[in-house]
């Protein structure tokens, strides 16, 4: 069975396999448009990039890059006027724009979820290095949950969360070997263990254990450590999510329960029309993958 993952985009879903990705979007005219692209992964060419932890860093970078490209295409379709040239909507971000968007996203995440909790904890009268790391971790998770709770209240994001749910349902149905029809897919769960929401929570949990080795550093070392150790922590979190995807037993699901619960904040029940879009993206990428050779790359989420 092909390893697949995806993400919600504007009025659509992006699905990816080891060697290809496809984005399907419901246009303002009501029809489904799809765009497909091959994935030229460095992990397929360099064995050392597939080593544990290292592969997690690479997978995260690739997922972010593909996600930005898919979002740009979906935004083009959403803004396209009736009768416009479809080729215009398929235009992607330039490499410079992609790098800029990547840096902005990473910078925002690091500032909000890494640096801010550290600085808040630094201002508290905590002398013990162990307690410092624990309190910082609790503040970090609290900020993350509050952030998800607040954005889930935004009306404009409701449809994005519905498409997120549609993505999960389609993948769950496919992995269960069921027929990919909206009425069938609708019966499946909104929750998936390899979801990026669960991955982010594990990044925060693992950070507590990693930072415990450094105690309570001075504020400038604190900021430097939180930034420089992020790739290592992300790589470790990837290994947890990867293991969970391969071993979905009761013990693993119990350990993953907090991350699965958080997905309730970022998914909503999709309509049959939205499931149709998600299924189209999945079918496109599966068809492309069936024509490709065996890949050494695994999909994160």
Regions found by a protein language model. Give the residues of each.
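Divalent-cation
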Residues: 1-82
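Polar-ligand-bearing catalytic/cofactor-coordination segments
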Residues: 1-15, 19, 23, 84, ...
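Juxtamembrane/disordered regions of integral membrane proteins
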Residues: 29, 83, 97, 131, ...
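Alpha-helical transmembrane segments of polytopic integral membrane proteins
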Residues: 67-70, 74, 113, 117, ...
